[in-house]
Every structure is written in structure tokens, then in C-alpha cells.
Amino acid sequence: MRIVFMGTPAYATRILEALMQAIEHDVVLLVTQEDKPVGRKQILTPPDTKAWAQEHAPSLEIYQPKHLRNDEAVSKIAACRADFIIVAAYGQILPASILALAPCINLHASLLPKYRGASPIQSTLLADEAYAGVTSMLMEEGLDTGVMLGFSYLHVKPNDTSEQLFEALSDAAASLTLKTLAHFEQLQPWKQVDAAMTHCRKIKKEDGLVSWQEKAQTLMCKYRAFTPWPGIYLASGLKLTELSLIDAIGKNSRIGCIERITNEGVVVACIQGSLLISKVQPSSKNAMHVLDYIRGKRLTCGDSMV
């Protein structure tokens, strides 16, 4: 089958790789976002799917339109005469003119109708869900509202970060893509139940701002959801780069203070529960072990961790 693949991050790359390796499929075009400046030096960097294709599939044509709502984009994709358009975290909503070209199947990284939108994996971790998953869905003009074709789910491990969960779900999505295509004609699509629907928005850098006035369990969920980006940080700019939950329910009077110091790090009191902080990163500096940080700041038990 002739496939146009539309995807941008590493999550999509694993699906693209599986399609390229399947002898029954012919990926004729990769559509991805434009190269973007990254990091402090603003180095122009290609999307993960493009970087992979350039190294492993140099003959695959790559198309990077700024927008899809124009005649050029529609003509480019239409010329491929695709049997299917596979979409995975592409980054733009597909207009009706493209949806009409071929069946468009989206591999959305949630168990729909939960977490429609831009940050399903982070939202799964923020809610401390026990399970995560991928839904294959026949696309329509609404945001992740199409009829569902199949699911794949897995248990979320207690210390999974969004990076680790992305990796696990990308493997699940790759397998689900191949199964959906293989059985497409026999599948019985079913509608989403709108009453069970939740939305999730795009993650912003400021979402990583945290306070010891929050529950330890909440901070732990934010740490898992926002690792590696944007990370979590205090109002002082101190980034908490490695931590673990010590106590989720204890009430504390000295909120934000160092309760004790161990070889592994420092235990800090939250409004409810406590966290073990092992590594931190001061603003404009490299990450370091927290013991080196408190030594330099001359902090000890009872002092505020700022």
C-alpha cells in the first residue's frame, strides 16, 4: 500500500521506521514540520523524523510545508496517490482538503476520548494514571474526535517520565499501525463517548514552575510529566533535576525546609508529604549533586531549600 506519513517527533519516528521496514507498504512521502532553532545557540535543527529519514532512508522524499491550508500542500500530497495517510504527532490540524485525499489514520498517544489535544502523555502522568495507551483513529475535522479503530495500552511504571513513556508508547503505536492497516477492511469503527472526553493543551515552559506549597505527590507527577522539558524549577530559578517521593501524606509545618540530609540527597518538606532531592541545576549553571549545592550555599537541616 502507498503511504504518506505525517509526523514530527521521536514518537512518530518509530512508527515511520516500522512502516519503512514492512514490505507490504511503500512510504512515498514524509510530511513533517519545518526545521527549528534549538538551544541557547539557536542551531537550526531538523525534526526527529526528518533526521532519521536522511540517515536511514535517503531516497524518501521529505516535504516541510509551513502551512497545510494552501493549494501547494494539497497538490503535493494528492500527487502521491496514497492509499492511506498515517498521522502521528504531526503538529498541525489537517484541513478537509487533505482529509478527503485518502483515509487518514491518526495514532494518538492516549486512550481516547481521554486527553484529546497536544500533550496526552504529559497529561497522563500529571493525573497519575495507572495506564497509558495509543488509539488508532480515522480522522475528521475535529481535534481527535474521529471514530476509533483500535487500542494498545500499557501499565505506567511508578517512576516513568514523559520521555520513557513516549518511548514505550511509540513501540506500541508502531505495532498498532501495522495491525490497523492489515485489518482495515474488517475493522468495525466505533464512536467516542463525548461525555468521557477530556482535553489537554500544549505544554509551556512556565508550566514547570513549582512551589513547596504543593503536595509532594503533585510535585512528583509534575517532575515525571515535565522531564525532560520543561523540567520543574522553583521561583528562584533552581531546577530540580532528580528527585523521588519519600512520603505522600504527612503534614508539615516547616514547608520548604530541609528535614534531613542523607548520602543520597536532602529531604524537603512540602505542604503534604516530603521529597528526596538528589540533583539540582542552578540558573545558568550545570546540574550538580544537591549535596554540593547545599554545601556551597551553607544550608543545613531546618534551612529553606531555595
PLM feature spans:
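N-terminal beta-loop-helix "entrance" segment that forms/cooperates
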Residues: 36-54
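Structural motif corresponding to alpha-helix initiation and N-cap regions
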Residues: 13, 46, 70-74, 118
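Internal anion-binding site segments
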Residues: 195-306
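N-terminal Rossmann-like dinucleotide-binding module
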Residues: 1-40
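Donor/substrate-binding cores of folate-linked one-carbon enzymes
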Residues: 25, 84-200
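Internal alpha/beta domain cores that form substrate/cofactor-binding pockets in large enzymes
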Residues: 4, 28-31, 61-80, 85, ...
